[in-house]
Amino acid sequence: MTPTLRRKLEALAERREELQHLLSDPEVVSNNDKFRSLSRELSQLEPVALAMQEEARAKADLSAAEAMRNDPEMRELAEEEILAAQARLDELDAQLALLLVPRDPRDEGNLFLEVRAGTGGDEAAIFAGDLFRMYARYAERQGWKVEIESDSPGEHGGYKEVVARVVGRGAYSRLKFESGTHRVQRVPATESQGRIHTSAATVAIIPEADDVEEIVINPADLKVDTFRSSGAGGQHVNKTESAIRITHVPSGVVVECQTERSQHANRDKAMKRLKAQLVEAERSKAAAAKAQTRKLQVGSGDRSQRIRTYSFPQGRITDHRVEGLTLYDLPNIIEGDLDALIARLLHEHQADELARLSEGT
């Protein structure tokens, strides 16, 4: 481990002691929001503390084994214990380095999934539908809920646009690298000549804003429209203007919801999504400024970035952000088997973050 990373570990150990002291302060205990926030931070540092304690024990074992090596009768046993202790220290060194990768506080939370057809006409809408189904099936495997907030079906299947809320622990941590442009190469069902077409769809992954995140939305900045829903709810939704469209005039962000029977419920859902979009826009602006000095291969979340190509004739998926990341398992992946792909992206992200930490940036 580099000296820079070791100093960061020591700083985290000091912060843990400071947090333990703060959480016993009556003033902090009486402030629910602050107490909850500091408790969450302390719980995130516990794995680091446990690994450092284990490292200290392994170092003590190594020292004892090295001392025992001076005894001729114990030398053989000492050599075995030295090898075991050194192997454990190497393992803990790698573990501690990964624990230094900053945890995104949004990782455990829910998200909004937006899939939109891009270039390619009807085939793009069909592909957008395929992508949405891929994520929905992956969510089902994880035990998450997928709630469609609004959709615009394509004329020949799929979606021109679909927005859903994905609810489940760790949802954002697993899907946050999916934002960007996804391209497909295949022979459309409507293609009589058997020619391969290329079309695209864009995906946006937006973390749901936490209740404690402060963002002030001036009601005067909102333009609210109602319209008849075409969503769930039977005939009732077509008789009343229960669907809501909210435009945040200063930013131009537009959200809508039509899945609930009541206008009030649709408005609540739409406002939750609007808050998430505005919070994420501020985060993206800050991240873009930070990234000007350094190129992030994974996790930029830029919707205009072409991140992946799905080549059906070859059964191949290529992620363009990671060198050599090509998987010949398209049939299973498009059916929601995303674990191998996500694992590679997470590994690349961790390596990228560790490189940044080692450089002290």
From Swiss-Prot:
Keywords: Cytoplasm, Methylation, Protein biosynthesis. Pfam families: PCRF (PF03462), RF-1 (PF00472). GO terms for molecular function: translation release factor activity, codon specific. It is found in: Cytoplasm. GO terms for cellular component: cytoplasm. The modification N5-methylglutamine is found at residue 235. Its main location: cytoplasm. It comes from the Bacteria. SMART domains: PCRF. HAMAP family: Rel_fac_1 (MF_00093). Belongs to the prokaryotic/mitochondrial release factor family. Peptide chain release factor 1 directs the termination of translation in response to the peptide chain termination codons UAG and UAA. This is Peptide chain release factor 1.
